[in-house]
Amino acid sequence: MQEQYRPEDIEQTIQEHWEKNNTFKVTEDNNKEKYYCLSMLPYPSGRLHMGHVRNYTIGDVISRYQRMLGKNVLQPIGWDAFGLPAEGAAVKNNTAPAPWTYENINYMKGQLKKLGFGYDWDREVTTCTPEYYRWEQWFFTKLYEKGLVYKKTSAVNWCPHDLTVLANEQVIDGCCWRCDTPVERKEIPQWFIKITDYAEELLNDLDTLDEWPEQVKTMQRNWIGRSEGVEITFDVADSDDTMTVYTTRPDTFMGVTYVAVAAGHPLAQKAAQNNPEIQHFIDECRNMKMAEAEMATMEKKGIATGLYAIHPLTQEKVAIWVANFVLMEYGTGAVMAVPGHDERDWEFATKYGLPIKAVIADAEGNQPDLSTGALTEKNSLINSGEFSGLDNQAGFNAIADKLTAMGVGERKVNYRLRDWGVSRQRYWGAPIPMATLEDGSVVPVPDDQLPVILPEDVKMDGITSPIKADPEWAKTTINGQPALRETDTFDTFMESSWYYARYTCPDYDKGMLDPKAANYWLPVDWYIGGIEHAIMHLMYFRFFHKLMRDAGLVNSDEPAKRLLCQGMVLADAFYYTGEDGARHWVSPAEAIVERDEKNRIIKATDSAGHELTYAGMSKMSKSKNNGIDPQTMVERYGADTVRLFMMFAAPPELTLEWQESSVEGANRFLRRLWRLVHEHTEKGTTQSLDLATLTTEQKDLRRDLHKTIAKVSDDVGRRLAFNTAIAAIMELMNKLTRAPQETEQDRALMQEALEAVVRMLSPIIPHACFVMWQALGGKEDIDVAPWPVADEEAMVDDTKLIIVQVNGKVRGRITVPANSEKDYVQEMATKEYSVAKYLENVTVRKVIYVPGKLLNIVVG
């Protein structure tokens, strides 16, 4: 072990040792408890960012810790390699997406290895390879055969910038999740998977996920959006037509004053046939740049159709309107409007002068004032004929029962969740394995023709997908008949919905999964990724697992037992305003900063002399130019320092503020530890520790050591509080550096302490600990060393620190033997000068003793 800590001299050598010895390669072993730790796989964008580093460091620390507990630990990594950014990069760099992607994978793989992550690289999965997506295509055809896949023309969210469809989950505040372009609605043929068939199970099984964050489960519950209500059929006046609406508030049914239908509803189409004004409004609705999320805030618009519906209970006519806030793909494409008790309906009725009727009382049971808005509380019914006076639930049931008895109502459970549209009009994705025969019938591609391979040697024009532009690619033969392949590709969330299962058998070629391997490793024990995936990836991930279960591929109900959503990594952000008024963001590395005595930034400039505005800490991003390159930090400080900072700076679920001064602090601690181990080992081997002859000071130090082992074990193993675990080790280190090293017992105790410290830190700083463990005489690599176990006897205090109070005020502290009786403690307290002076010339009225903690002497 060299005297100075120089990561550049050790890290690469140790990484090569791990690779050569297959240190982290695992196979199924029924004699060992398995542990599957997984971080969400990265998109190969070209370079790792600090968010990746944090995610993967957390996963690696958990994995290494579990290995030290003797478990058979699987920690794989792979590449979510399809996706739109590759197409943009290919056009920009005049290449094809495939070589750009593979080049990025190669570079990022090197970055991961330099960070010392203990992956089983033999299980690496790349989702853009035919070996991977072949089984995704096969599974899709099986879902089609089971009736879980269908194609229909539907209104979709269309991104005019990326020229592709977006799932509802991919529309954020009316804009594309990827490029922030306002989303349009467009009707095109799409392939769907029936996630709605699993809505109830997806909802109910959230209750079994005890170790998932409540926030994620709440977001999924809200997205699934289960509601109980009644589907009601209205006759249309003067015709044989009917219309159906769904309501969760049948208690307000007597307050319906109009109904509204979507632009695509058959009644809207009928009304538009001879009315250009209605047709114009329908066209306007269809071209809206609108997603469901914006419906609540947009201006409500509508047009009367001239048609009327007959209220089933009152037989009154209510006007039918076409409205821009009703979507054909939600529910029945029609809603009943109760403007007295729904804010949106009130807003619309007020705008167009439609009747507003009160059928729910105010809190006092009186007629409510509806002049300024709707009353939305669920109070008792009024103005509702035979139902007046009933409370909300009784009114719900009575009206639902009456409508059902009349044959015009049916109780139903509805879901906000829509079926998963998996078609994308892009090139760089897995081809959808369906084809159209000459007679127009659509069939799945047979198993023996899978995979449908995506050609990789293509030219990108940035406008049309190469497989759509090449008519020859689509031509094929199925069962002897000419056919045309589907030219849409899968939503890339398909690949990331089952990769975790393929890691269990990446080379298996007899099927999608090897049941033996999959059922040994699954479910995942710890899954780590960002909260931003709560209602996209994590919903599809759960859904796909249930699909695979029902296909007999896995035998568990959920894909992951525990989920950790790590916080974002923040960094300082600076900008100056240019002559054009635009903000020009300057990298923190280029900012020259002045700070006050509290370390707050008071002034910043860049090398060109621009005075910079400090925009505070914000998420590292390209847009704010405040990303810190992990590669630079590894080259400057070493991988272990970066890893140590990541684990120490904040609890894993909270945001982490990148401060280079704190990185330097982590590096200083590492050097101190290295120096202490070096100084100790330079003095030669130590004798065995003789517990029977320890001095009081040595017992105290050993007690601190084993209490630290107990705390760190709990912090790392149960609480995932890595920052407090490291803080406890740092506190112990301070005591070790002050501990005398004059006797063989002193040195033997130091040996025990350093062996424990190095093992506790090895999941976090594995390279340095590898070397220090060897220097301390470890007979095998630290990678197979067990986690230290706290000695319960060593943690027992021989003495207790007692707080002494006089009349409830702290007057002193004394140390007494652990089993001391009250009289002895009182006697010792009265001999303590700081206490005795308050006992002069007074009478002791009472003495209260809390054993081992506190003595309160009450005087008068």
Curated annotation (Swiss-Prot):
Locus of motif 'KMSKS' region: 619-623
Residue window of motif 'HIGH' region: 42-52
Sites where the protein binds ATP: 622
SS bonds (residue pairs): none
Membrane-spanning residues: none
Highest taxon listed in the record's lineage: Bacteria
An example Gene Ontology molecular-function term: aminoacyl-tRNA deacylase activity
Reaction catalysis annotation: tRNA(Leu) + L-leucine + ATP = L-leucyl-tRNA(Leu) + AMP + diphosphate
Keywords carried by this UniProt record: Aminoacyl-tRNA synthetase, ATP-binding, Cytoplasm, Ligase, Nucleotide-binding, Protein biosynthesis
Similarity comment: family membership: Belongs to the class-I aminoacyl-tRNA synthetase family.
Official protein name in the record: Leucine--tRNA ligase
Taxonomic source organism: Proteus mirabilis (strain HI4320)
